[in-house]
């Protein structure tokens, strides 16, 4: 597998990005990222750990993010059972972050991206301090070099957004005191509150989910979506990091879209003997097939897609790139 984390620009992609920057958006010529050092990061997820670690060893991103700690039913932080100390020891401690997400276990269920637990924890300074202390203790316990906060759906509630900004300000001070790095993941819709967030923080903006399980068929990102989100990310008071997602989805008329890795998408192409087409506006691949029961439509991002997306960001100075995710991208030779 070719490296998708690369600071070397492909000439063709650079030329394409330059042409687009001039012609596709009236304000593109004015768009410029703040000064920043280059960085590459990839997420390693607990449900695909071995493949993720293997790809991390091949790709060698500068930063690795372990996904993820979440909330027990009582509101305390826990690691998935699959993430043992032995697993975590496979990663270089000096480049690994632990991600924290607002998923909470409730009996046999897991509430995904739940804001109820956040409203309780972030509402008052004392509860924020306790939450921060628990975050730092968990990172110290497993020798992580940094903290990643990935709390989603906060943009839906203005009061929660205000408390989140206070939480990040306080967390920034505590992580600095403990010699821990900090990055904060933001959904594109959260960028409307960019000016309310504290400075001196790395903000990882999700440049994906344009299409997905919530919509009909299409790419995770396209040129217009990337340009628009870059223009919003440039307003952040901290250092923006651009996060792209590989893989894709399989849609049918009767079921919710199913998430696919690149390996799974290519396997479907081979099984049903179909050739994908590459979309001009996103450079994503797409194809359709019939499994004998119903028609399917698949869109996914491959290496060429990711390189194109990165070039769009790098052309205007965004040099910190994260990839969701490592694992499921190794194609048979």
Language-model segments: residues:
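Glycan-binding loop/region signatures in secreted carbohydrate-active enzymes
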Residues: 99-117, 246-309
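Substrate-binding surface in catalytic domains of secreted glycosidases
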Residues: 41-43, 73-82, 162-271
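Bacterial N-terminal signal peptides
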Residues: 13-22
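Glycan-recognition patch characteristic of GH18 chitinases/ENGases
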Residues: 29-131
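Short, acidic/polar
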Residues: 45-58, 125-140, 187-194, 302-312
